[in-house]
Amino acid sequence: HEGPVANWSAVSGGRSRIGPAPPIIAIPTTAGTGSEVGGGCVIITEDGQKIVIGSPNLLPKMAICDPELTLGLPKTLTAATGMDAMAHCIEAYLTPAVNPPAAAIGLDGLERVVTYLPRAVTDGQDRDARWHMMMAASEGAMAFAKGLGCVHSMSHAIGADPDLQAHHGTLNAVLLPTVLRLNAPHVGDKYVRLRRAMGLEEGADIAEWITDFNRQL
């Protein structure tokens, strides 16, 4: 396509300008965004701007999720991208849109993150943990087809500031506990299923647990 990349951004109406593309084969090298199963992408320009582009025409025809490609991912990026996957799973489940299959996929992804992200951070060569995190990332993106929430609304806005140089996953990790406390009175009994997926006791403070989880990572 001709013209500045910004012309194809979602906020500039680029979605309608993006036509059919050659078949895309996505090969992720992190476990967080889930872009390999989505029709969107983020391009960071030379001046630090983050351009969000999305279209059904960008949906990959094939995703090759090979955990071997994530074995060398540094601890900080393993943790940050993993928390991005967690935020996707939780926010997709909590959004008011009704989509039981997507909710179930998100909860399964959340269970994987809680179980395997600490292992992947502790030992980057843990292939089993890396595989489960790749699955969690893909599940998170499948689930958020039904929507996201305040965590991503804020992290995208803050992360777009080129002066901050803030990682999207790190922002999600920091914002998630506060948003969970804010949402608590408005989501009915959904936190009951969240606790079960996370292996927490009934009545446990999910926001506080995630704060501690962040510290451990």
Locate predicted features:
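Glycine/threonine-rich beta-strand-loop-alpha-helix active-site module
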Residues: 1-68
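Phosphate-handling active-site elements
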Residues: 2-11, 162-169, 185-186
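Short helix-capping/linker segments at secondary-structure and domain boundaries
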Residues: 3, 93-99, 148, 181-189
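Glycine-rich phosphate/pyrophosphate-binding beta-alpha loops
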Residues: 32-33, 138-167
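Carboxylate- and glycine-rich phosphate/diphosphate-binding segment that chelates Mg2+/Mn2+
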Residues: 39-146
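Gly/Ser/Thr-rich active-site loops/lids in small-molecule metabolic enzymes
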Residues: 100, 160-175
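Mobile late-domain/C-terminal helix-loop "cap" segments
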Residues: 177-217
